[in-house]
Amino acid sequence: MPAYVFSKESFLKFLEGHLEDDVVVVVSSDVTDFCKKLSESMVGEKEYCFAEFAFPADIFDADEDEIDEMMKYAIVFVEKEKLSEAGRNAIR
């Protein structure tokens, strides 16, 4: 489960690289569930934050498998002071 920590400038470049002319962005602020738990990863067992988001299904003309493939990133806007040392060191 890779996670990236971007500076503002790097995040804008990241967005530009993913936003082709016909791409729109769906944003939901409806977090329906959240928990922290240990999970296996490529680097061993690590604590992760799990969040469940909800958005209206009627905005898509796609089946569940197609929508699942569309879900690529979760984005958290956070002030630098709320990052741990590891988070600050990971800023690109």
UniProtKB/Swiss-Prot annotation:
Protein name, as recorded: Uncharacterized protein AF_2331
Q: Coiled-coil region(s) at which residues?
A: none
Q: Which SUPFAM superfamilies match?
A: AF2331-like
Q: What's a Pfam family this protein contains?
A: AF2331-like
